Amino acid sequence: YIQVIFICWLSINSITEVYGKDPIGISLVKWSFRTQTAILCDMAKENGAVAIDMVDLEKWDIVKEKGLTVAMADGIDMGIERGFCDRRWHSSLIENYKRFIPLLAEKGIKQVVCYSGINTDLSDEEALEACVEGLKPLLDIAEKANVTLVMELLSSRNTEEIFTKQRFSYYQCDNPEWGVALCKKLNSPNFKLLYDVWHMNDMGRDIMSDIKKYHSYISHYHIAGIPERKGLNRTDSFNYQQFMKLLKKVGYQGYVGLEPDRIEKNLKSTIQESITLLKNK
């Protein structure tokens, strides 16, 4: 009984060390803010973010030296379009991830992104089986390294609107039902989903309902201003405070990555206002 209490205390204490009193940490997605990594780290710390997100190998040490966490590693994949549902890329993808997962463990990085890729030929079930074939060889090494492979849910909506460049036509993992089916097939604690709020809203999803249903399969979230994918704003059509409250209610203890579309001006004010909204201040 005493041992159980001690373990619980350690768990709570480790969360507090990382996030402060809040079990949810805010991270800034590297590609979204057009500035040097070190400068972005400083902006993050000034505004209460605790991590940098989607960080390439060569930038890992910069983030750590600044006293922040790498919330999600990037750059190990072959791009969003060339993913695990296409068997042509399996050998290269498996080689890449097998080589880099031990490095992630060495650096204390717990998560790395991966993608389904686009699918123009297979049925959903066939694409599912292809992903299982490609990902299964990685699970043993990921489990031993305590690194989680996280597949991102992205919008595949085909449209000529201005934000089309941030959508990916024929992207396979464009809904949580398919993603959860993949999680169940792989049956590993080291394979989870990245739920991108902007992308899933673009697909017409009920975000709150998805979180209630599928939160146990989700280890990471990305968010941007809805609908225009800028920084978060009080006039946006999405209730960011209710989103954060729901994450806490379902027991989420991870990062929410701020991922607007390539902010080049007013970075400080964009970061400050967005984090203020997420922290409900």
What are these regions (language model features)?
Residues T69-A73, W89-H90, A130-C131, F168-Q172, ...:
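Short, hinge-like loop/turn segments at secondary-structure boundaries
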Residues Y19-G25, K30, R34-K45, G108-Q111, ...:
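Histidine-acidic metal/acid-base catalytic patches
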